């Protein structure tokens, strides 16, 4: 805890409000709310915390806060601040997904579509459906029952849907507005929960057709009834009042929360939403934040009723969402809440099993590696590999593994600038010097371990630059390969002795992943650079092709192979004159 934070903690008010945690770059990394700011913010810097909260606190260099007049104001402000800053530790609903609806378009000849975007266009929207498959299945059923127009633009002749009896072909025939209105009214009746009545009417028509010996028509109606049954049976009936409602329940353990949402549409449980995320506040506060975010998403449907557990503030949720919020004590609604809660507990249990397995592969492997090398746990590992072909286009690459996992946004590529010919030792010296000079200059975090994919000469070159030029003391180890170029061992120490590692240990598997990744990254960069240089050299002797047009061609075609397949017209599309294009094609044939 720095001096600035200590001073700010001493003057925090005992009022509700929001707080914004910031890192070294003054970036907001977490937004929270509190009933009493003084108690909440101080709690981060006192006492013990789980690993994820410790990581958050370790990055906090400053904070600010905003006082509000009530808890509900704090909640609303928190939601707005999360939207504004998108902090990396506020992870519960970052995907911002929108749910699909079935839409009847407002056109002379309306059509049915599945869409995720609700617009003020006088179209009629039904939903939401929690996944696109449920929406598409329902639309497919409606397409079979009601022959509305299918084509986006009207063709000049009938299509297959007309021959299947699923379209009235307004492209050819004059379909009255009254006919379209009747079809739309039937679809609306179906989507508003009237499918049982529609099924009854179809059954009566089927029996009537059979009595009149219209067996083909009776079979067609029977198939429609069966299709309604097969589609609607997938949606479990839960309530008898055909209302739309969402059921929320949550469970929490070991610093994690799971929220389950059951979507009830026209009295049916059609799907659920499962969200798992780390907790940084009290469970009730986390749940309120989740609900505020859940319904603040664009186009997210707010039903007429929401069911929530007894443990949350019903009045605050009603103020926040402006809809009916109930906390049922018994009956079918209470059973739904209990079922959602049970599902939340099960999902948490599964999450912990996966976390344990993942931690064994990542943090567990990091611990094993640290023990084997007799160093502090190498949470941050930076690995280097050189790549060239007989000294041509020499490059180097660095990959970063944080907590045993690739941290790709910090990968770096290096073109070798000061070395001529195939000199891996000098190349390694240059890259290590460039990398850690920049680290010192920009005050970036030093790694806990540096891995060199190379022999003793490259490892010693890296150590020499670090210790004798940059005065840095960072553990350096080398990745040893066998005759098949596979990870074999690790060497470290003054004499670079082999470090014994079990071949079936998580530490060994981690080294394999690191070695494969740094090799892949270096090779792909070398191929990219070699291809670009080959591209440039082919164009050097073509009159009319200067640096500007080289870049133009590279951007348009991307490779020599694609250029060789191109025609004069293709080159002209790329902005190359016809005469120059002809010269290019001749040059590419050589």
From Swiss-Prot:
Family according to the record: Belongs to the UvrC family.
All copies of domain GIY-YIG, residue ranges: 14-91
Alphabetized Gene3D superfamilies for the sequence: 5' to 3' exonuclease, C-terminal subdomain, GIY-YIG endonuclease, UVR domain, UvrC, RNAse H endonuclease domain
Record's protein name: UvrABC system protein C
Pfam families: GIY-YIG, HHH_5, UVR, UvrC_RNaseH, UvrC_RNaseH_dom
Residue ranges constituting the UVR domain according to the UniProt record: 196-231
Function as written in the Swiss-Prot or TrEMBL entry: The UvrABC repair system catalyzes the recognition and processing of DNA lesions. UvrC both incises the 5' and 3' sides of the lesion. The N-terminal half is responsible for the 3' incision and the C-terminal half is responsible for the 5' incision.
Compartment list: Cytoplasm
UniProt keyword terms in alphabetical order: Cytoplasm, DNA damage, DNA excision, DNA repair, Excision nuclease, SOS response
Organism: Bacillus pumilus (strain SAFR-032)
Source organism, top-level taxon: Bacteria
SUPFAM superfamilies to which the protein is assigned, alphabetical: C-terminal UvrC-binding domain of UvrB, GIY-YIG endonuclease, RuvA domain 2-like
Statement: the UniProt record of this protein carries the keyword Cytoplasm: yes
Assembly information from the UniProt record: Interacts with UvrB in an incision complex.
GO MF annotation, one: DNA binding
